[in-house]
Amino acid sequence: MPHAALSSLVLLSLATAIFADCPSSIWVQFQGSCYTFLQVTINVENIEDVRKQCTDHGADLVSIHNEEENAFILDTLQKRWKGPDDLLLGMFYDTDDASFKWFDQSNMTFDKWADEDGEDLVDTCGFLYAKTGEWRKGNCEMSSVTGTLCKTAIPYDKKYLSDNHILISTLVIASTVTLAVLGAVIWFLYRRSARSGFTSFSPAPQSPYSDGCALVVSEEDEYSVQLD
């Protein structure tokens, strides 16, 4: 494969990886959103402390809007993230209209509450039970949380990327473009050199005299010398 074509493929691959829909490899894409599980235990005073773990990354606590999304989160939680049995959902109980709402302000169009859940209170939070996929109600007053599931819509807001990330991405792209151009130049010089080589090594022109004629001329010269 020509150097230029190979370099172009490398450039395309790197550009795709850098500018993928999700911020980085720790995020997982599903439908129109990206998800990441922050595997750290933090001490908290209220749910806002947990939520800050996500908002610091330009995201929010997870919201779930259909059965497919719930199943995806459950499957990824079990197989990839290895999260806790009870995962805090990004919802709160609004006493003004006596209903649960999502922190990310999306509509509450789906729920999966377990049948035995009881009365809703002002300090009631929602949890995803990882063994069954059902939602449970629990007290928002907690001292610590093991793992936080964050969600953000695509496209990810680039302002939350660090300066180092942007710098590295720029350097990678610039280096790849340079390699692509260099590869194209090398390939061009190689092709030109190959064409010149065919001309340089073309067969030498034949003498107008055959070997026999040359031998006769040589013998005549020798005979003349002997007469002298």
UniProtKB/Swiss-Prot annotation:
Ranges per topology, Extracellular: 21-165
Compartment(s) where it occurs, according to its Swiss-Prot or TrEMBL record: Membrane; Cell projection, Filopodium; Cytoplasm, Cell cortex; Cell projection, Microvillus
UniProt keyword terms in alphabetical order: Cell projection, Cytoplasm, Disulfide bond, Glycoprotein, Lectin, Membrane, Receptor, Signal, Transmembrane, Transmembrane helix
Record-linked InterPro entries: C-type_lectin-like, C-type_lectin-like/link_sf, C-type_lectin/snaclec_domain, CTDL_fold
Principal location listed in the UniProt entry: membrane
Residues the record marks as carrying a glycan: N107
Keyword set includes Mitochondrion: no
Transmembrane parts of this sequence: 166-186
GO BP terms: phagocytosis
One GO cellular component term: filopodium
Protein name: CD302 antigen
Organism: Rattus norvegicus
